[in-house]
Regions:
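Residues forming the flavin
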Residues: 1-257
Length: 257
């Protein structure tokens, strides 16, 4: 028996770095507040074109990480150590994508789209993390030097143009999102904000189908969590796991309390 699958919407983008002191000043009202850790943030925007732009996996006092797992693919993520003591804050700033962006609508269309972005990103940086300042990204220009602050990364970097990795509508959405976030957090859209490409694995690009009882077409198989396409992070995966566990109990141990 086959498990039916379908392509699903997800989101892709880049890691954006800012000075942690700038984020602290916006969130706390001061660059440093005794007793408070490096400040986090969460920003979202719903654009008129229907796309969403939002922060994902924000890392206060953190590092941009080369998290590539496949040959000739480059992918970034973010991390913070327990004490959150790096000089920069970083977060993925991602744009929603749907099957209409994939160029096909079969179950693996999103996977192929994801792989296409990762391999092109690899070429841009020749295996290193490609970086571009936001101002240069807006002007379609190669970055030649950092601005008032430098990058905090786990992995080697190189200046390269990130323009054209996303399609024109997505690029414009990203720029509009950054500008909007600049109204929420002063300096968020500063010209020397550092962009690292690309963040492509925010959630699964496909979904294993299940019915209203959370069960697939195969009895006893319950697609669940992030890999099955029903979550986009630790918390949402945990919640989906609880729902599936409750469904299993209801079916096999209805008398359980």
């Amino acid at each position: 028996k086959n498990l039916p699958m379908q392509a699903k919407s997800f989101a892709v983008g880049v890691r954006a770095e800012h000075p942690q002191k700038m984020i602290n000043a916006s969130q706390y009202g001061a660059e440093s507040v005794p007793g408070l850790p490096a400040a986090p943030y969460k920003v979202t925007a719903k654009l008129e074109n229907g796309r969403g732009v939002y922060s994902f996996c924000m890392c206060p006092g953190g590092y941009v990480v080369n998290s590539s797992s496949t040959e000739n693919h480059t992918v970034v993520n973010g991390m913070s150590y327990h004490d959150r003591n790096s000089k920069n804050a970083n977060s993925a700033i991602i744009v929603s994508v749907s099957p209409k962006d994939f160029g096909a609508d079969d179950a693996l269309a999103g996977v192929r789209y994801q792989e296409k972005l990762e391999t092109e990103n690899y070429k841009r940086g020749n295996g290193l993390i490609p970086q571009q300042l936001f101002g240069d990204f807006c002007d379609d220009r190669l970055t030649t030097a950092y601005g008032d602050f430098s990058s905090c990364t786990k992995g080697n970097t190189v200046f390269a143009k990130l323009n054209g990795l996303m399609n024109a509508d997505m690029e414009q959405s990203f720029k509009l999102g950054m500008e909007h976030f600049g109204h929420l957090i002063h300096g968020f859209d500063r010209k020397d904000a550092i962009l690292s490409g690309m963040e492509t694995r925010t959630s699964s690009p496909l979904r294993i189908k299940r019915d209203e009882s959370f069960e697939s077409n195969i009895s006893g198989v319950y697609p669940c969590g992030e890999g099955a396409g029903y979550a986009g992070g630790i918390t949402s995966a945990a919640i989906d796991g609880i729902k599936v566990a409750e469904a299993i109990i209801k079916k096999y141990r209805p008398d359980f309390k």
